Amino acid sequence: MSCNIIKKISNKRYYSINYKKKTKTISFYKYCKIENIDCIQEKLFEICKKLEILGRIYISYEGINAHISIKKHKIEELKIFIKKTFDYLTDIRFNLYSDNKKQPFKKLKIKKKLNILNCGIKDCSFDIKNTGHKLTANDFNAILMKNDFILVDMRNSYEYEIGHFENALKISSKTFRQQLKLLINNLKFYKSKNIIMYCTGGIRCEAASAWMMHNGFKYVSFLDGGIIEYVNFIKKNNYPMKFLGKIFVFDDRLYEKVTSDVLSLCHQCKIQPCDNYINCKNKKCNSLFIQCIYCNKTLNEFCSNFCNEYYQSKN
């Protein structure tokens, strides 16, 4: 293991490690009042350095949001440290991802931010704590057996494309901020309906449920722990899996496979079923897209002939 320690840039603390052993990916978040975020940042940095944790942690006066990788035998030590050190995080949920065939992160970044989630809400009367009803994975699974609800996917369009629950409503968007702007208008005819929301780990649908409550919706619930918690619950109990395809993840793995269902098509030929996201080989472009094996042979991991030709001219 090689370690490049320690740099400090304004509101960031970060370092990088070259791992040779596999790690586990976990995420956790909580909306809560945090007063001394500078102190929190330093304490988190020291424990992460000690436990060789990589990933990203955002902290603000409204809470904490983390997505990290850690060696399996060190997870419990991290949990104990967080719950003992920060009394407002004693009940925080840790989501454990299942697929770590590829290392998710190359460095750790702990950053102070104005908000732990970029939602773009500027209404001063909005209360993020006034959320909809939290559903356990068991309750959520039971509700899916019924037909008296509207199921809303609170993830971006490119996430929905490769995996989602059957009959889930997609709010077409590239960002969560954009999605919130569309949400209320798209669901305005369902105010009397039971609305169930889900996302990857829970933070987006929790915030979205509060925004809906703020806008007069009364029957709003969300999946606590998100798809990650649901998938773990279903696998543990050997129940039929109702999430189809892959979970898009915001790290170097890009996705976790849940079922063998392929829900999308190659973005280039638009014919071949495919759900493998890659980034354009031209780093100046770096577009995220789905490319089948046939288009890969002709375009070689580029999103277009233009990027291919540009790359060749520079190399």
Curated annotation (Swiss-Prot):
One Pfam family named in its UniProt record: UPF0176_N
Superkingdom of the source species: Bacteria
Active site per database record: C199 (cysteine persulfide intermediate)
Record's keyword terms, sorted: Oxidoreductase, tRNA processing
GO biological process, one term: tRNA modification
Molecular functions (GO terms): oxidoreductase activity, acting on paired donors, with incorporation or reduction of molecular oxygen
Presence of keyword Disulfide bond: no
The keyword Signal appears for this protein: no
Domain Rhodanese: 145-235
InterPro entries assigned to the protein according to its UniProt record, in alphabetical order: Rhodanese-like_dom (IPR001763), Rhodanese-like_dom_sf (IPR036873), Rhodanese_C (IPR022111), TrhO (IPR020936), TRHO_N (IPR040503)
Catalytic activity: uridine(34) in tRNA + AH2 + O2 = 5-hydroxyuridine(34) in tRNA + A + H2O
SUPFAM superfamilies, alphabetized: Rhodanese/Cell cycle control phosphatase
The protein's Enzyme Commission number: 1.14.-.-
Family under the similarity heading: Belongs to the TrhO family.
PANTHER family membership: TRNA URIDINE(34) HYDROXYLASE (PTHR43846:SF1), UPF0176 PROTEIN YCEA (PTHR43846)
Function: Catalyzes oxygen-dependent 5-hydroxyuridine (ho5U) modification at position 34 in tRNAs.
Name of this protein: tRNA uridine(34) hydroxylase
